[in-house]
UniProtKB/Swiss-Prot annotation, chain A:
HAMAP family: MetX_acyltransf (MF_00296). SUPFAM superfamilies: alpha/beta-Hydrolases. It comes from Hahella chejuensis (strain KCTC 2396). This is Homoserine O-succinyltransferase. Substrate binds at R227, D357. The active site is at S157 (nucleophile), D323, H356. One of its GO terms (cellular component) is cytoplasm. Disulfide bonds: none annotated. GO terms for molecular function: homoserine O-acetyltransferase activity; homoserine O-succinyltransferase activity. The record marks R325 as: Important for acyl-CoA specificity. InterPro entries: AB_hydrolase_1, AB_hydrolase_fold, HAT_MetX-like. Belongs to the AB hydrolase superfamily. MetX family.
Length: 385, 197
């Protein structure tokens, strides 16, 4: 709970809902006749609407990226370290929009929402959405907010994929794109981890083919397992070692097979449990699928530089040395393709011990890079506030 | 602007595509893109320099020439590859020189000339590795591991069939004069070469 709102916070924020009664045809061929997107905004849109920045969320993220919902909030939004007055995404300069993606479970239309055509929750019948679908629905939100183009589209991990897709799909509407701790496509190992997570969920006896809602039950054990696997891949060996080492919860070994004995086990259990209480299992399946499917080069015989051809923005690509989910060489692959396609790109490989999660943690070098890039973005804006 | 950079800028044609190895704070690329419509990228490893390039809006890519080389760039992907004051600090300058001419038809290279008379005199008189304005390091903490002279560099170019288009030397005030042009290996402090295959 914040006793006082820190001066570099965006303060108390209120989520908003945008209702769309315009059909959206998805990449899978299915159509959503109506849907809603939950979003938040920070800062003020300037007179010529040129200072808007879009924040795209990662796998389990949502619209609440910065500030607090109330004075009772225990934690600020998920990217509060980077969004606020004086922070890299400076709300004194930029108007920031952050949303919950379609298929999410934080207020945007998703598997847990009521399907207006049946009057029941979509559940597993919610269509598979892709990064491209998200970007298209985000463009509809931009139209609604009367934002003709983004000064920058920014995202980490799965959010970085959306930033990349924006630059390809709507080149005229993106001036800058920051792709952080991301990849142009998942590796087989990445997909394998996602499949383990999905299998954990679908093999929970309470999963009922995704119709757990109708059985008034919930596959929380499976979701917990999925998150535990995911969480291991978000940290590095070093950061886990530093946080927990081989510390025991009790003084002595219990020689029991089922007890939680090591601190790291206890931590994973805690993270898994907390997550399984707050996240929809069908959404988790959906989001990991969107990750698996993303591959803008596929339509160009695997040639990423060809896929990037339409883009007009200036890119920032950032990777972190200990990120083994999307390691630096995945970012370099992207940078090389951008150079080949003669795009404006800058790349920094930030030395951080925090693994994939480093993109959420404000280390000095990372913030310097981000500040440098966003400072230049601000300078480009005519009549910046 | 550093004088070797201000000489180089006159050797770069407008509208060309440039790769600047060890681009520092991006001064040269910033000038070239503002005044000569040059498009380019700088490679750099210093984090302060990378941040400064980002501020300037110069495309900078973090890449260590020693560990990664230039193999991630395709043949002839640039018009010009520039490397100022970095040749002497890399592990394999000869390999790098070939790589530079694989990426572009032309290259510009500047380095401190170890044949400069004051350095020779310093070593002869004191019997110690020279420390000067252009080489301000002691032997144990210098980044310069392959110091060479004007003559050494030309010998390398000769062996590798690299053609020298222009060469010049400047003094520590970064001036050229008739004396250092006459005896460059003895009187030039910084060597500036424009080479091609």
């Amino acid at each position: 709970m914040p006793e006082v709102i820190p001066p570099d916070s965006v303060g108390i924020v209120t989520p908003q809902v945008a209702q769309f009664d315009i059909p959206l045809t998805l990449e899978c061929g299915k159509q959503l006749n109506s849907f809603q997107l939950m979003y938040e905004t920070y800062g003020e849109l300037n007179a010529d609407r040129s200072n808007a920045v879009l924040i795209c969320h990662a796998l389990s993220g949502h619209h609440h990226a910065a500030g607090y919902h109330s004075m009772e909030d225990s934690k600020p939004g998920w990217w509060d370290s980077c969004i606020g007055p004086g922070k890299p995404i400076d709300t004194n300069k930029f108007f920031v929009v952050s949303l919950n993606n379609l298929g999410g479970c934080a207020g945007s239309t998703g598997p847990a929402s009521i399907n207006p055509e049946t009057g029941k929750a979509y559940g597993p019948d919610f269509p598979v959405v892709t990064v491209q679908d998200w970007v298209r629905s985000q463009a509809m939100l931009a139209d609604r907010l009367n934002i003709p183009h983004w000064a920058a589209v920014i995202g980490g991990s799965l959010g970085g994929m959306q930033a990349l897709q924006w630059s390809i799909e709507y080149p005229e509407r993106v001036h800058n794109a920051a792709v952080i701790a991301s990849t142009p496509r998942l590796s087989a190992q990445n997909i394998a981890f996602n499949e383990v997570a999905r299998k954990a969920i679908t093999s929970d006896p309470n999963f009922y083919e995704g119709r757990y809602g109708e059985h008034t039950t919930y596959p929380d054990k499976g979701l917990m397992l999925a998150r535990m696997v995911g969480h291991i891949t978000y940290l590095s060996n070093a950061s886990m070692g530093e946080k927990f080492g081989r510390d025991l919860r009790a003084q002595t070994l219990k020689f029991g097979l089922l007890d939680v004995q090591f601190e790291v086990e206890s931590y994973l259990h805690y993270q898994g449990e907390r997550f399984s209480k707050n996240f929809d299992a069908n959404t988790y399946l959906l989001m990991t699928r969107a990750l698996d499917y993303f591959d803008p080069a596929r339509a160009h015989e695997g040639d990423l530089s060809k896929a990037l051809e339409p883009a007009k923005c200036k890119y920032l690509v950032v990777s972190f040395t200990t990120d083994w989910r999307f390691p630096p060489d995945r970012s370099e692959e992207l940078v090389n393709a951008m150079v080949e396609a003669k795009k404006s790109v800058s790349y920094a490989e930030v030395d951080s011990p925090h693994g994939h999660d480093a993109f959420l943690i404000p280390t000095q070098r990372y913030m310097d890079v981000f500040h440098g890039f966003m400072g230049r973005v601000a300078k480009e804006i005519p009549h910046a506030r | 602007m550093r004088a070797d950079l201000s000489i180089i800028k006159d050797w770069v044609q407008p509208g060309t595509e440039v790769l600047d190895l060890g681009c520092g704070d991006g001064t040269l690329l910033d000038y070239l893109q503002t005044h000569k419509q040059v498009r380019g990228y700088g490679l750099e490893i210093s984090s302060e320099n990378i941040t400064e390039c980002l501020r300037k809006g110069v495309n900078v890519i973090e890449q260590d020439l020693d560990s990664k080389g230039l193999s991630n760039f395709k043949d002839k992907s640039f018009d010009m590859v520039v490397m100022t004051q970095a040749l002497q600090a890399v592990r394999q300058p000869d390999v790098l020189l070939e790589e530079m001419l694989r990426l572009a038809k032309e290259s510009i290279i500047t380095f401190p000339n170890f044949g400069y008379w004051r350095l020779r005199y310093y070593l002869a008189r004191k019997g110690q590795m020279p420390v000067s304005k252009t080489l301000p390091y002691t032997w144990y903490n210098t980044p310069n591991i392959h110091l060479c002279t004007f003559k050494d560099f030309e010998e390398l170019c000769y062996q590798k069939n690299i053609h020298i288009l222009h060469r010049t030397v400047v003094d520590d005030e970064h001036r050229t004069n008739w004396l250092n042009q006459l005896w460059p290996n003895l009187l030039g402090q910084i060597a500036i070469y424009h080479v091609t295959r």
